[in-house]
Amino acid sequence: MVEEEVAKKYDSSFTAGKNTVQQIQAQVDTATQEESSQGPVLLNQHPETTSVPYTPETVGQQLMVSLPGEPHGTSAMPSMCPSLILQPCATTDPMLLQPQVMGPSASNQASVSATLEWQEMLEAAEALLALKNSSQTRHQPCGMPGTAGERGLQLANPSMPPRPTSSGSLPSGHLDCMSLLT
């Protein structure tokens, strides 16, 4: 019973919407012709109806209408009938059909990704320094000692094993001993 009432109401709304669209299309056509010769004209007549393709969305929503020959820019239709939404008859570009919005979650995701990448690079640099230090203890020392107050990478010394450095205190180093940092 309720479904029948909704169907009747939808059919009557659909028919009324179709008639309104046909009247508006005829008024727009007439206004376009008259405006080009005489300037702006107020429309209050109801010329004969014409066929207009239409696509209703669902019951309770606005009627979606595509007008043939309507430019993709602004139109006089929204000011005359604000309950209509105009759209082009066909869209062939698939990129226009997909949302192009980049929300805050995408921005946060990019920031987290960059931070993780930086952390991985830092860990790789520390691992390379540790590897270089371990290989230097097996070979002869570099021969160019750092200054007495310098913290960080300790050059190989036969009496003292190399001390690993933290990521915050990496020295710029001597070119003949360390070529990792740029």
Swiss-Prot record:
Coiled-coil region: none
Bias type Polar residues, positions: 26-39
Keyword Transcription: yes
Record InterPro entries: DMRT-C1/C2_C
Keyword Transcription regulation listed: yes
Pfam families: DMRT-like (PF15791)
Keywords: Phosphoprotein, Transcription, Transcription regulation
Segments of this protein annotated with the region Disordered: 26-48, 136-174
Tissues of expression: Expressed in Sertoli cells in male testis.
Highest rank taxon of the organism: Eukaryota
Similarity remark: Belongs to the DMRT family.
Protein's name in the database: Doublesex- and mab-3-related transcription factor C1
Lineage: Eukaryota, Metazoa, Chordata, Craniata, Vertebrata
